A protein has these predicted regions:
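Pyridoxal 5′-phosphate
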Residues: 1-393
Length: 393
């Protein structure tokens, strides 16, 4: 699909008009109508806190869970809310018990925060972290599968894998990876931070033991909205990071899984409660709904990559099939901090320059949301050409 013609979708967001914002992938950005709904929930909470939290909230969360479950193709009984995908990863890792005989498998593309969580539980238990080295540039998703499978051993207990890598923007062949691991009796924990809203999801089809994803990134919900999916037969093992009233609730009409996660103590649930509005709003912007939005954003990311590669005279570091709404382009070696700062201060461009310690020392990572335009990527390309020329002297 061709990227859509430039159109002022940005009017629905509060983004600063004098900044060329090409970093939706960092924290997302919430549209004005969704923020208005969030504020309505906050007002309801403050008008009658007891009624809202003690009586209304449970039913409201169940309604949200139903909408979200339909979007990710899951049973609502298998979903709970967490504040972000990093929390989801920590929740699972710190609920499980490992031994010095266990190996925890991940890749060199794993998100730093989640890798830190993996290292933490490994250090605490004596387990070993094993890293599969996935090359960049990469020619095929098959290379990912081969790299991961090569690191499997009889000691491999769990694999922590990104669905879409954060630093490098690669769509991993996650269903094939889960299949390879599951066939060997290895549990899988998938960091889907960037997947909801960029890739059509059916969590049971993917087959991961555990899957967590953000709603505040590509679904454009308010900050602090994410979910954790746990296969039914593993839910008794997974406990929230905060143990509260649900731990000894006498209720039998709801699973312990829901009772514990739905009430972590007093909190503001408005971000979770706004998720259906975000899904409806984004899905209503184009005639083809979410499928068209995801396809257009992907086409826009590919167009952005083409613009940058041609301007910088470099080759794309991965095949088109491994792109969703993020794309990276290699840059000459140099300071990533200085270049990112110069882009913002001199050109008003907010875009991450990623330090990549493999085959490419620096990458520029662009995001493609509906409010972005191809002309913005052309402007970025022009700025990079000038700044890189200045670096080279």
């Amino acid at each position: 699909m061709r990227p859509e013609p430039d159109k002022d979708w940005s009017k629905f967001w509060w983004l600063e008009p004098d900044v060329t914002f090409l970093n939706h992938g960092a924290f997302g950005a919430c549209p004005k109508p969704v923020l208005e709904v969030q504020q309505q929930f906050r007002l309801r909470l403050e008008q009658q806190p007891l009624r809202f939290l003690a009586q209304d909230l449970e039913g409201l969360l169940d309604s949200v869970r139903q909408v979200l479950a339909e979007f990710v193709g899951a049973d609502p009984l298998d979903l709970v809310f967490v504040s972000n995908a990093t929390t989801g990863i920590n929740t699972v890792l710190r609920s499980l018990h490992f031994t010095p005989d266990d190996e925890l498998l991940t890749t060199n593309h794993e998100y730093n925060a989640c890798r830190n969580a993996l290292d933490f539980v490994a250090a605490r238990s004596g387990a070993q972290v094993v890293v599969a080295e996935i090359p960049l540039p990469i020619q095929s998703p098959q290379q990912v599968i081969e790299a991961v499978v090569a690191k499997i051993s009889p000691k491999t207990r769990l694999a922590l894998l990104d669905h879409v890598t954060s630093q490098t923007g690669l769509v991993m062949p996650i269903q094939a990876l889960v299949r390879e691991l599951s066939q060997r009796g290895i549990d899988t924990l998938i960091d889907g931070a960037h997947a909801p809203g960029t890739i059509p999801l059916s969590l049971p089809t993917i087959g991961a033991t555990y899957y967590t994803g953000n709603c505040h990134k590509w679904l454009c919900a308010p900050k602090g909205a994410a979910f954790l999916y746990v296969q039914r037969d593993r839910q008794a093992q997974i406990r929230p990071l905060t143990i509260s009233h649900g731990a000894n609730s006498p209720r039998t009409d709801r699973s312990r899984f829901r009772l514990e996660f739905d009430w972590p103590g007093t909190y503001d649930p408005s971000a979770y409660l706004s998720v259906p509005t975000a899904i409806e709003f984004l899905g209503g912007l184009l005639p083809g709904g979410w499928p068209e939005l995801m396809a257009r954003n992907r086409a826009k990311a590919l167009a952005a990559r083409k613009v940058l590669c041609e301007a910088l005279n470099v080759s794309p570091p991965c095949p088109d099939e491994m792109i969703a709404a993020l794309a990276v382009v290699p840059l000459p070696d140099g300071s990533y901090q200085a270049l990112q700062t110069s882009l913002l201060n001199q050109y008003g461009i907010e875009v991450p320059i990623v330090p990549w310690p493999g085959g490419q020392k620096r990458l520029v990572r662009v995001a493609a949301q509906i409010y972005n335009t191809v002309s913005q990527y052309e402007y970025l390309a022009q700025a990079l050409v000038k700044l890189l020329a200045a670096e080279a002297g």
